[in-house]
Amino acid sequence: MSFFRRKKLPSAIKPGVTFGRLLIKRVDSDGLTMLAGHLAYVSLLSLVPLVTVVFALFAAFPMFSDISVQLKSFIFSNFMPAAGNVIQSYLEQFVANSNKMTAVGTCGLIVTALLLISSVDSVLNTIWRSKNKRPIVFSFAVYWMVLTLGPLLVGASMAISSYLLSLNWLAQSGVNSLVDQVLRIFPLILSWISFWLLYCIVPTVRVPPKDALIGALVAGVLFELGKKGFALYITMFPSYQLIYGVLAVIPILFLWVYWSWCIVLLGAEITVTIGEYRDYRQQKAEQQAQPPEGQL
């Protein structure tokens, strides 16, 4: 019957449908959920070493002594919803215990923390299907720079923000209210910039900055929405607490880390698909511009 015949899509939604098909094809081909599971496992293995190294860096700089407390609160309240307080208390105990380790054990912690950065590098290059390899020395330098300079830059930005908020002339001029509004969306801005840098710098192929900006924005928005949705799910449907009791924090943390990596990798897939869609449109335009064979 004519009702069941395939209808032509409206021209206004054709680009979106085509882009969606390309994206779904890439996500299925790359095995996004499997890659996210791999990164979630490595993240849980590297979590304590990574936190230990980061806060050891803050301890080495007295200027960051007050900022480290603010940074802990910011990370656990904005990036680990619902169970953030419980996870924070456990991690602080683990970090305190790691301070008693020998030099060999400390080197092991650093290597484990670098393992996470190396895994992220490998997975993103898998998504970009890049076969280019960086020299080992250069890769180690990049990983070490991310591990050391990244936390210090975040700490410096928070120190500057705290200093500006403490100035009297800002409070009198009414700029404080504007700064408060900016600070409310600061987690989204920070996620957006972080994802953009991740998509631009880590792949060993050239990534158009505009494409990475769009993919990072989608990932940042999904991350914020996912954070609120996950916190709502944990509070409204406390099945994990009922089943696991005190140990509920373990599956909750694993589920959140896995969901976070799914969002990050989806942003990477969107970034790649934007370039593929551009090439698809260009090839289609070239085919339409060529005259039929009978008219040659």
Curated annotation (Swiss-Prot):
Q: Does the keyword Transmembrane helix apply?
A: yes
Q: Would the keyword Membrane turn up in this protein's UniProt record?
A: yes
List the InterPro entries hit by this protein, alphabetically: UPF0761_bac, Virul_fac_BrkB
Q: Give the highest taxon in the source lineage.
A: Bacteria
Q: Which UniProt keywords apply?
A: Cell inner membrane, Cell membrane, Membrane, Transmembrane, Transmembrane helix
The primary location reported for this protein is: membrane
| Coiled coil stretches, renumbered | none
What's a GO cellular component annotated to this UniProt protein?
Answer: plasma membrane
Q: Where in the cell is it found?
A: Cell inner membrane
Note the Pfam families from the entry.
Answer: Virul_fac_BrkB (PF03631)
Residue ranges annotated as transmembrane are 44-64, 67-87, 104-124, 136-156, 185-205, 212-232, 246-266
Q: How does it sit in the membrane?
A: Multi-pass membrane protein
The record's HAMAP family line, in alphabetical order, gives: UPF0761
**Which PANTHER family is this protein grouped with?**
INNER MEMBRANE PROTEIN YHJD, UPF0761 MEMBRANE PROTEIN YIHY
Homology family: Belongs to the UPF0761 family.
Name the record gives this protein: UPF0761 membrane protein Spro_4878
Provide the species name: Serratia proteamaculans (strain 568)
